[in-house]
Amino acid sequence: MDEEKLPCELHKEGSATQEDHGLEPEEEPGLQNGTAASEGLSSHISGPGGEKTLEGTMEPVRGPDVALPGLNLSLTNGLALGQDGNILEDSIEFKTWRSGPAEEEDVPGSPCPDAGDPQLGLDCPGEPDVRDGFSATFEKILESELLRGTQYSSLDSLDVLSLTDESDSCVSFEAPLTPLIQQRARDSPEAGAGLGNGDMGPEGDLGATGGCDGELGSPLRRSISSSRSENVLSHLSLTSVPNGFHEDGPGGSGGDDEDDEDTDKLLNSASDTSLKDGLSDSDSELSSSEGLEPGSTDPLANGCQGVSEAARRLARRLYHLEGFQRCDVARQLGKNNEFSRLVAGEYLSFFDFSGLTLDRALRTFLKAFPLMGETQERERVLTHFSRRYCQCNPDDSTSEDGIHTLTCALMLLNTDLHGHNIGKKMSCQQFIANLDQLNDGQDFAKDLLKTLYNSIKNEKLEWAIDEDELRKSLSELVDDKFGTGTKKVTRILDGGNPFLDVPQALNATTYKHGVLTRKTHADMDGKRTPRGRRGWKKFYAVLKGTILYLQKDEYRLDKALSEGDLKNAIRVHHALATRASDYSKKSNVLKLKTADWRVFLFQAPSKEEMLSWILRINLVAAIFSAPAFPAAVSSMKKFCRPLLPSCTTRLCQEEQLRSHENKLRQVTAELAEHRCHPLERGLKSKEAEEYRLKEHYLTFEKSRYETYIHLLAVKIKVGSDDLERIEARLATIEGDDPALRKTHSSPALSLGHGPVTGSKATKDTSASDT
């Protein structure tokens, strides 16, 4: 074979090329932007069969690599060729592709027609190599980098993909193939077998019709995800496998059976469920993607198209909850990176807010997932919602910033009107005044603001609750092993302190129920209740377990507790009920002081009912209140009340009685010691207040334990859980009106931890059946 060496010159595109049968190695000059070669990205080709061994794998891959013309490559930092990246090229004029402007220079070559390149390990036993050296080298670099990369399939791994901006971490350049190499790729039988139908158009673009009719079958087999930008590359003979290995693609005559078998291997080799879903979806998505011309200004060019496709797939799976939970949606949409913004845009495209008012659109959006996370994360999610609402309603005169302002205002209004905060609720005039000049320097329409205010006031915003969060909610029923039986328990929220909740048995014994009129006299820690909340309100009271429920409707066994009933519920553990002798405006009034020192006044229909309520509340508290914890030890002189446990005691009645007696002796001793050090003259007002507070606490505790001991001793002496017998015994001892014996509401008392001796205990059978 005659060989001819031609000088290599750089010239503009479109210059004539000359054919020659010989190949000579040329050294590739480095990129002008100074990008260093990445270590460990080299690959070598050895053996007469064209066997390639890629670094990072143990499995050889065979088959020719044919580069497509017009291919746009996007490489991450560090993928530029080094000094050892030689390129095999014909003895013709060619153009060196660089990221900077091209400069014409002569590149000397050395004739090497039959010998292989020692650095690339290429042996030339006489058969021609149809691959362009420039493209083959870059394909080997890309394959090696892709093998070292990680397949991004899960929600967490996608976070890594979006850590850096695409524009900051990529060096983009275009490398269209020369007409000579294009002609060789079309004429070669190996290349034709690898290309299949529709993979290379007449102009060198990636075909848009490369569906399942080609030799390679599904476009899935030409889809290789990069570790940074998920570039979609045309890979003619290799099949991407999620675990990092490759399988040989079918040859020139691969059938449909082989294609299906290879695809099954792909899906079965994936270890992540979400990755399998992503691979199975890529057939329909990538088959319609068209290649871009060199120099295209499409914003999805140079690797961004792969990221956009990944964001679209993830958004679809988040919307349909395929492999994700509802709580994962807000966590992904609320992140502050470019990829999460792409995902949010694709996710919001599933919602159509056309023709909806802002409050209705917001309700629809919030029902899809729970809006969780920190304030800035939730604000980002609402920003995406506002943008989508403006896209669906282009005729709305309000700007996107104005819609976002109104959305945040509605969220705050919902919290103010329907939250557990104590204080005066926001009025409509205050809502309008708070939004003055926030519509791009102008005011919102008052009719619009009034409509939105009334909508939120009449119907609060509700969003979806995740299944895991539902188990932890205040109204979720769970099974709790207690004693010898299984009880249904719920989380009862104390309206005075929303941060403390206690499990209560729904099938607990009902000790008394009847009509009571309530007045709130003091809030937590004895603070005076504001005047606007001191009014008398009539309720139907139910003493069930250690909870006093105040219902607006009459008590029924088959009726479930509403949210309002739970808000008004009062826990009577460590509480003390007495006659309100210092209150003379109404008759038959009892005073209830709870463990957190809240004070309530209740008016009963008659004196007998008042005394019955006092007896049963105190008796339940005496039997079921757990022993108090020791007081905290501190160097501060400020007095602090000890924490009283809200759980049910595990002691029997005799042990409970001894515990109360020991506590009474301790409190009595502390009170005597406290009174041995009276106030000194000239004592500061703050110290005097601390002294009086401690004395008041010890006096109250002494009175409470005396009442507990008296009632519990009578109950043990009677030897029955029949509350009528206990009331009669107490009336005889105290010489009170015997009419106390004629109460007819739940006349029995039973312990949750021991056998019931009385036969008149009433149980909430409907709750136990559920």
Curated annotation (Swiss-Prot):
PANTHER family, per database record: GUANYL-NUCLEOTIDE EXCHANGE FACTOR, PH AND SEC7 DOMAIN-CONTAINING PROTEIN 2
Record region (Disordered): 1-65, 181-304, 738-770
Positions of the PH domain: 509-622
Annotated transmembrane regions: 619-636
Coiled-coil ranges (or none): 650-677
UniProt keyword Nuclease, yes or no: no
Membrane topology term: Single-pass membrane protein
Matches recorded under SMART domains: PH, Sec7
One GO BP annotation of this record: regulation of ARF protein signal transduction
UniProt keyword terms in alphabetical order: Cell membrane, Cell projection, Coiled coil, Membrane, Phosphoprotein, Transmembrane, Transmembrane helix
Name of the protein described by the UniProt record: PH and SEC7 domain-containing protein 2
GO cellular component, one term: ruffle membrane
Family: Belongs to the PSD family.
Family annotation (CDD domains): PH_EFA6, Sec7
InterPro entries: PH-like_dom_sf, PH_9, PH_dom-spectrin-type, PH_domain, Sec7_C_sf, Sec7_dom, Sec7_dom_sf
Location in the cell: Cell membrane; Cell projection, Ruffle membrane; Cleavage furrow
Domain SEC7 as annotated: residue spans: 256-459
Statement: the UniProt record of this protein carries the keyword Transmembrane: yes
Superkingdom of source: Eukaryota
Compositionally biased residues, Basic and acidic residues: 1-24
Alphabetical list of PROSITE patterns matching this protein: PH_DOMAIN, SEC7
